[in-house]
Each structure stands twice: as C-alpha cells, then as structure tokens.
Amino acid sequence: MSLIEGLLQTSSTVTLLGTVLFLLVPYLRSSGSSSEEQGKEPPGPRPLPLLGNMLQLDLKKPYCTLCELSKKYGSIFTVHFGSKKVVVLAGYKTVKQALVNQAEDFGERDITPAFYDFNQGHGILFTNGDSWKEMRRFALTNLRDFGMGKKGSEEKILEEIPYLIEVLEKHEGKAFDTTQSVHHAVSNIISAIVYGSRFEYTDPLFTGMVDRVNENVHLIGSASIQMYNMFPWLGPWINNLTRLKKNVADLKMEVIELVRGLKETLNPHMCRGFVDSFLVRKQTLEESGKMDSFYHDDNLLFSIGNLFGAGTDTTGTTLRWGLLLMAKYPHIQDQVQEEISRVIGSRQTLVEDRKNLPYTDAVIHETQRLANISPMAVPHTTSRDVTFQGYFIKKGTSVIPLLMSVLQDDNEWESPNTFNPSHFLDEQGGFVKRDAFMAFSAGRRVCLGEGLARMELFLFFTSLLQRFRFSPPPGVTEDDLDLTPLLGFTLHPSPHQLCAVSRV
C-alpha cells in the first residue's frame, strides 16, 4: 500500500489536508490562473484554492455527500473536485430535462484521467465524436443481430441457466458466496454474443478475465483513483493505478489472443458474433482502399473490453442484490415463488411470461431501484455553452447526473429508502412502469445493453427462484444481512454468503 492510499484510509481531515498540501507543489508550479466565467453559475459550497471542495466530500462515498449538498443548494449545483468544476444534477425532473430534453447539450462523455488510461480514446463507453457514434451504432446493430434480438438472446440465456443451476446444486444447501457463479453465468451471455461461444466456468482464461473486470470496478471507484482524477501528477504514488493499468494490459493481451483465434477461422459469410462482424467490416473497407476508417484494431479491442466489462458487472451485480434481498425479506420471496409456481409450474420460464408475472417483475425493478448500482452514472460533459434552469454552464464542464437522487427522489417514490415492490404495482396488482425508473440512465448515453440486461435479470432471477429457496447461513438472521454496499465504481453487495436450498 502506498503512502497516499494509507492516508486515505484514515478519517482524519487534517491528515488528508496536510498530505495534499505537501503534494501540491508540482501542481502549483505548473498551474496557471483560471479565466473569469460568464453568466450566473449554479450555486454550491465555496471551494478552497486548488483543493476545491474535497475536504467536504467523502471520496469513498461521494454520491452520499452530493445528495446531502442537493438538499442545501437545490437540484443543480456546483462542486469542485480539486480545481475541476463539476455541475451536479439532482432529482428526476432535472436529470430528465438535461439528459432527455436537452440531450445534445449534455450528451458528451467526460473523459477522466483514469478513464483515458484504460481506453485511450477508443471503444464505445469513454469516447466522443464521430468514432463514438460509429462504434455505438455498429455495436447496437450487431448486438441486436447476435443476441439482443428477442430470440437470439433468450436462447443464449436459456442455454446458460442449467449450468448456473448445476453449480448452485453442488453446494447442497450449504452457504456459499454468490459472486463467482453469478458473474460467470452473466459473463457467458455477453461472451456468446461477442465471441460466438460460451466458456466453461473452469476455463482459467475466462475466470481470469472476469476476476480482473470485478477488481477494476472496485479500483476505479476507490478514493485513491478519485484523487488521481483530481491531481493526475499523483499517479506514480498510487498503487491502485498501477494495479488498474496492469489489469487493463493483461485483459488486452487476452482479448488479442481470442481475436487472433477467431481471425484464423473467420468465414465472412457466416459471422459467429460481434468480433467476426467487425473483422469482416474492417476487411471490406481495407479492400476498398479506405484505410483511415474507425474500424481499426484499437477500436475493436477496447469495444470488446467495454462490452465484456459492462455486460458482466452491472447485470451480475444486480442479480446478486436480488438474491440477497430475497434472503433478507423472506415474505417477499414467498410471494415471488407463489406467483412463479402458480403461473409457470415446473416448466422453464420464457420472456413472454413476464406479462403474467407482475409481482416478480415488480420485485426485479425494485431491486434495481434500491440497489442503485450506478449512483453517479458515468460522468457527462457539456458539448456547448448552455443556459439550464437559468444558470450558465460553460462548454466542456463536467456534469454528474446523480442517478441515486432520481431512484430515491421522495417526490417520485412513496417510500424511497425501503424495499417496496408496490412501487411498481397498481391497486389490482398489475405491473406499472414508473417514469423515474432510470436504472439504465437516459438520453444519448443510455445503456446500450438495456434490453439484454432486462432479459437476463428476468430469466436468471425467475429460474433461480423457481429452483431454490435463498436464506442466510446457519446462525445468521435476516436482520444480520447487511445491505451496505461495497464501494467501487458500481455498488456491489458487501461480502456475504447465502444458502440455496433446492425446492424440487
């Protein structure tokens, strides 16, 4: 552990201040004065020179601090992460107005130093401009062709479910950690779509990639990486950054090997997945003399990494939250299983059954809402000078759509801080869509895998609840199950074990 990371683990503001002031000397030597801004800017706490508001922010849980600040400063306010000015959008109405109604103004991605380090301006998630537009369009088209269309993805998920059930059955009702088995199953869906085939859960290449993705999610959300994003010159002293870069390099080499194998067996007339389709497009453009297109190796490699990472972490994490919540609230699990038994019986659940399982569907949506796995979304930036709700926001300003404040907006949800499936049910027990349900963000940067994720959550969740009863380990009560999230770029459940007892 480096000196900086050790100090960040302490709760002493004085210690943190002293450390930062000590390390600010190189920054002071290289920084110039900022220009005067125009117009009335969103309000916010007064920043300190260079430090900004970092002494007021909990870098381990910045989303909590930002929610508290919104109570004082309103639905649009300014905070300073070091010298970087950030506009925070809070509450459903404000976030929707920015991301949906003014999508062109707020639709660019803010590329932090850490994001740039592991994407280098390529791929789908952390890019802007024409390259992003083309890669996102191509990804949407091909993911639809190779899995996100109803039948293709449903078949892949139904193929994977027995493998996951088999792993859980091997525990014979004894306590186990859900992380590995759930993430392996979910990762195999995106792997089948991207590469054209699934992996065995014992394949060391596959398990290594999944483990590195999970670790990267934790590292990118760590306090030390937040410090690095504010003060990039701290990089040489941050061990988490070294680990992050090594993981990214290792993942890149593994993807290169997988792509090499697919190239050797490529049939342009029978594409197996996203990679094949990309390679065929690249080859076609090169044969026509277009050597400067966006279809180059870096965009391929980083797009694969983006799809694999996002397709593994968010859905797998949400599914784990769902199982934990069922164990914590057995009366809700009872109602889910009663509905599944009454409507489905012992046959395999299909996507078309969703309309006949309103309570189960409501529980899945409420899990996504309460789990709140992406509380600050992925940062945006303004594409031009904009006046928003009477405030001036300069072009290139970092913007945080505080999704936590949307999913827990007390103007939109009857009991925002409790697990209440009734949020998504009408008086007759039918499923009700809620406009403030923004678990996948919104606008130009809405999750491109939303359709696939919704299908995975429904089919995996119903199949597992049909087959198993989830409960705390012996000696642990429902009240003992901790819903405090593990800190990271996305919010995972804290380490825990569950028992999966067969119902058949």
UniProtKB/Swiss-Prot annotation:
The residue ranges crossing the membrane are none
Gene Ontology biological process terms, A to Z = organic acid metabolic process; xenobiotic metabolic process
Q: Which Gene3D superfamilies match?
A: Cytochrome P450 (1.10.630.10)
Q: What is this enzyme's EC?
A: 1.14.14.1
Main location, first listed in the record: endoplasmic reticulum
| UniProt binding sites for heme | C447
| Protein name as it appears in the record | Cytochrome P450 2K4
Q: Which cofactor does it need?
A: heme
Species this chain originates from: Oncorhynchus mykiss (Rainbow trout)
Q: Which family does it belong to?
A: Belongs to the cytochrome P450 family.
Membrane association type: Peripheral membrane protein
- Kindly list the GO CC terms recorded for this protein: endoplasmic reticulum membrane
Taxonomic lineage per UniProt? Eukaryota, Metazoa, Chordata, Craniata, Vertebrata
Q: Which domain of life is it from?
A: Eukaryota
What are the protein's GO molecular function terms?
heme binding; iron ion binding; oxidoreductase activity, acting on paired donors, with incorporation or reduction of molecular oxygen, reduced flavin or flavoprotein as one donor, and incorporation of one atom of oxygen
Return any one Pfam family short name: p450
- The entry's keywords: Endoplasmic reticulum, Heme, Iron, Membrane, Metal-binding, Microsome, Monooxygenase, Oxidoreductase
Where does the record say this protein resides? Endoplasmic reticulum membrane; Microsome membrane
Q: Which reaction does it catalyse?
A: an organic molecule + reduced [NADPH--hemoprotein reductase] + O2 = an alcohol + oxidized [NADPH--hemoprotein reductase] + H2O + H(+)
